[in-house]
Regions:
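Donor-binding/catalytic cores of nucleotide-activated saccharide
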Residues: 71, 92-212, 219-232
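Cell-envelope/extracellular polymer assembly enzymes that use nucleotide-activated donors
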Residues: 4-7, 25, 35, 199
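Glycine-rich, basic loop-to-helix element that forms the pyrophosphate-binding segment
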Residues: 66-82
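Catalytic core of nucleotide-sugar-dependent glycosyltransferases
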Residues: 216-224, 230-257, 273-302
Length: 337
């Protein structure tokens, strides 16, 4: 198998409990012409041995053992050895429908797409909740349409009822490896940048000519409260600053400020709400942490810039109450969500 249709890159760290379920969904894909690259990020459990066992049983499986460096750098290590026409990223505690790769690859071929993405279904307590961002196959063709899509991934315009119009994820898609390699695109470290996926999306979309979105929810995202993405701290909160600095720098490099500003501000507003929610649902001194966010000058500037009157009623009420800077009130609102 010299050049498979899809290289599936799976970063692995401390997921012994879930790895078999993930791998079963990959090894049994209806599209057999794939390679599966397992990147062991110096996992402290039995995962390194499990990876080697998978490689011994199936020639489509490659294993990379590396020093621990985090999710973004593990994905980069997978990219360095990938040979497929397209690349997919799957988190090792998640799993996918058995026909996901075949469906996305066939669509990519039919539309000559640089990326094809699908919907996500959230998996918790043995039950699925699907999220549909499109209700039919949707094609974004040409630089202008792809950039408009990219901006809606960053954040929707004020009139949009959803805080997230299109899910930001590198996992529910296949990406052209040629676009990635021709433009030397790689992930930042999530240890420095709060959302390496969104920065990756911008780097990619700015170089793409066709993105296709299918409505089927092929990707099962495991809602694991103890996982890295569900832990919140002031250190993680501080990474907001670095993230938004990088995000605006990326956007300013390809667009005029008036084109991206409202999208960026809406994204920042969502991170404000998520920061409040993160502290409320974390163990710690909740009231002090929420007060810490409310008194941050970063949000004061945001509140002075954004046209709140153009928001849907629910969001307008929330941010009006946030201006009162009452930790107790914001804690109540977060718990009601």
């Amino acid at each position: 198998m010299e050049h498979p249709k899809v290289s599936v890159i799976v970063p692995i760290y401390n997921v012994e409990k879930y790895l078999d379920e993930c791998m079963l969904s990959l090894l049994n894909q209806t599209l057999e012409d794939i390679e599966i690259i397992l990147v062991d990020d110096e996992s402290p459990d039995n995962c390194p041995k499990m990876c080697d066992e998978y490689a011994n049983k199936d020639k489509r499986v490659k294993v990379v053992h590396k020093k621990n460096g985090g999710l973004g750098f593990a994905r980069n290590s997978g990219l360095d050895v990938a040979t497929g026409e397209y690349v997919a990223f799957i988190d090792s505690d998640d799993f996918i429908d058995l026909d996901m790769m075949e469906h996305l690859y066939n669509v990519a071929t039919e539309y000559n797409a640089d990326e094809v993405r699908c919907g996500i279904k959230f998996y918790v307590g043995g039950k699925f909740t699907e999220r549909h961002d499109v209700d039919k196959l949707t094609v974004f063709r040409g630089k202008e349409q792809v950039v408009d899509f990219m901006l809606d991934v960053v954040g929707p315009l004020p009139k949009c009822k959803r805080d997230v119009k299109y899910m930001m994820s590198s996992c529910c898609c296949i990406h052209s490896r040629k676009v990635i390699e021709d433009n030397h695109i790689r992930f930042l470290s999530e240890r420095e940048c709060l959302s390496e996926d969104l920065i990756w999306d911008i780097d990619l979309f700015s170089k793409m000519n066709c993105v296709v979105y299918v409505p089927e929810c092929h990707y099962a995202y495991r809602m694991n409260p103890s996982s890295l993405t569900h832990q919140y701290s002031r250190e993680k909160y501080q990474r907001n600053y670095n993230f938004f600095e990088i995000l605006e720098e990326k956007l300013a490099g390809i667009l005029a400020k008036e084109k991206y500003e409202l999208h960026l501000l809406r994204s920042q507003m969502l991170y404000f709400r998520n920061s409040i929610s993160g502290f409320v649902h974390n163990n710690g001194n909740v009231k002090d942490d929420v007060r810490y966010v409310l008194n941050d000058n970063f949000w004061k500037r945001l509140f002075s810039l954004y046209p709140f009157k153009r928001l849907p009623l629910k969001q307008r009420v929330y941010y009006t109450l946030a201006k009162l800077k009452s930790p107790t009130l914001m804690i109540i609102l977060a718990k009601l969500k």
